[in-house]
Swiss-Prot record:
GO terms for biological process: isopentenyl diphosphate biosynthetic process, methylerythritol 4-phosphate pathway involved in terpenoid biosynthetic process. GO terms for molecular function: 1-deoxy-D-xylulose-5-phosphate reductoisomerase activity; manganese ion binding; NADPH binding. InterPro entries: DXP_reductoisomerase (IPR003821), DXP_reductoisomerase_C (IPR013644), DXP_reductoisomerase_N (IPR013512), DXPR_C (IPR026877), DXPR_C_sf (IPR036169), NAD(P)-bd_dom_sf (IPR036291). The keyword Phosphoprotein does not apply. The gene is dxr. This is 1-deoxy-D-xylulose 5-phosphate reductoisomerase.
Length: 385
């Protein structure tokens, strides 16, 4: 029985991780989880999985859940805020921490978990995008496995099994192209949040859905792949694949290309990460290779999707520039979802911040958090958000 902690248990990845744990309850036990404001989901998790610990980031929700547990005589150790996140991430009994929490808030507890010797099933892109150098160094020092949960990185990870990283010629990170793959740039001027949230293939949370529509999500994945697989940016290419059946490919120096194909269900890469290094019987509908139809591939449009181009620039510059890229995008996406800016202004704001702030090297987590705070403050003050 493997003891699991999920950071961000009520979100899209967290919910699907719980589904895998439920289906394989003879192998996994939810010992601890974190959540923010989703009261009903939190209560369901507590009553269904009987975890020992729960960390809640929103004060009002924390008090409400605490009252419910006291009234109903439910035994659980409830914790609040960042201290709670760190506590559950470093529990002695926890063996694997699933970091599915969205945003920069996941960086510190993930690092703390690594320093406590916990293996990580990583679904929080921001952790590697902003702190990749610190995270991978800590993982090496503590002999910790970083197991990718993203479908693309999970696919790359599988394609690399039994092969040497030094033999990699090119990593192809596939992308569906999002809802606006066939749209012209001028057609994107008046895009609404509702339109941008309609992803053609994946069922995801709001933030990642908007990021997918701008292809900034793919840019974040490129930076993530750089750190996960220790590969230069010149060897990481984005390949638009509208059918979303090939989840990524690795080309080797001898010309061989290994690809991972599967149905579009996040529970598959989650299951692989939880069970690694073994495989278990499927928890998802298998891919019908006889009826999957034609598979097409095309180059991304870097002019229409400038966010992808900026991601490569930020990644190559290194230092705190990926943090500036990520933080500005987080705030801009939130502004767009609240109808405070237009769709194309998301990338404009990201570019503005990358040009405004000086790049610096990273010595510790504080450098990352300070850079993020400055970017957020600048945008909110300038755009009255």
């Amino acid at each position: 029985m493997k003891n699991i902690c999920i950071l961000g248990a009520t979100g899209s990845i967290g919910t699907q991780t719980l589904d895998v744990i439920e289906k394989e309850s003879n192998k996994f036990k939810l010992v601890a989880f974190s959540a923010n404001k989703s009261y009903e989901k939190i209560i369901t998790i507590i009553e269904k999985f009987n975890p020992v610990y729960g960390a809640i980031n929103d004060k009002e929700t924390f008090l409400k859940v605490k009252d419910h547990c006291n009234i109903n005589n439910i035994k659980i150790n409830l914790l609040y805020g960042m201290d709670g996140l760190i506590k559950i991430s470093t529990l002695e009994e926890v063996e694997l921490v699933v970091t599915s929490i969205v945003g920069m808030i996941g960086l510190v507890p993930t690092l703390e978990a690594i320093n406590a010797g916990k293996d990580i099933a990583l679904a929080n892109k921001e952790t590697l995008v902003t702190g990749g150098e610190l995270v991978m160094k800590a993982a090496k020092q503590n002999n910790v496995k970083i197991l990718p949960v993203d479908s693309e990185h999970g696919a790359i990870f599988q394609c690399l099994q039994g092969n040497s990283y030094k033999d990699i010629e090119t990593i192809y990170v596939t992308a569906s192209g999002g809802p606006f793959r066939q749209s012209k740039l001028e057609e994107l001027i008046n895009i609404t949040p509702e339109q941008a949230l309609k992803h053609p293939k994946w069922n995801m949370g709001k933030k990642i859905s908007i990021d997918s529509s701008t292809m900034i999500n793919k840019g974040l994945e490129v930076i993530e792949a750089h750190w996960l697989f220790n590969v230069g940016y010149d060897k990481i290419k984005v390949l638009v694949h509208p059918q979303s059946i090939v989840h990524s490919m690795v080309e080797y120096i001898d010309g061989s290309i290994i690809a991972q194909l599967a149905s579009t269900d996040m529970r598959l890469p989650i299951q692989y990460a939880l069970n690694y290094p073994v495989r278990n019987k499927k928890v998802v509908e298998k891919l019908d290779v006889y009826n999957m139809g034609n598979l097409t591939f095309e180059k991304p449009d870097f002019e229409k999707f400038r966010g992808l181009k900026l991601a490569y620039e930020a990644g190559k510059l290194g230092g705190i520039m990926p943090t500036i890229f990520n933080a500005s995008n987080e705030v801009a996406v939130n502004m767009f979802l609240n109808n405070h800016i237009k769709y194309l202004e998301i990338v404009d704001i990201v570019e503005e911040c990358m040009n405004k702030f000086e790049n610096k090297s990273i010595k510790d987590v504080e450098d990352i958090l300070n850079a993020e705070a400055k970017v957020r403050s600048f945008i909110k003050n300038k755009y009255n958000f």
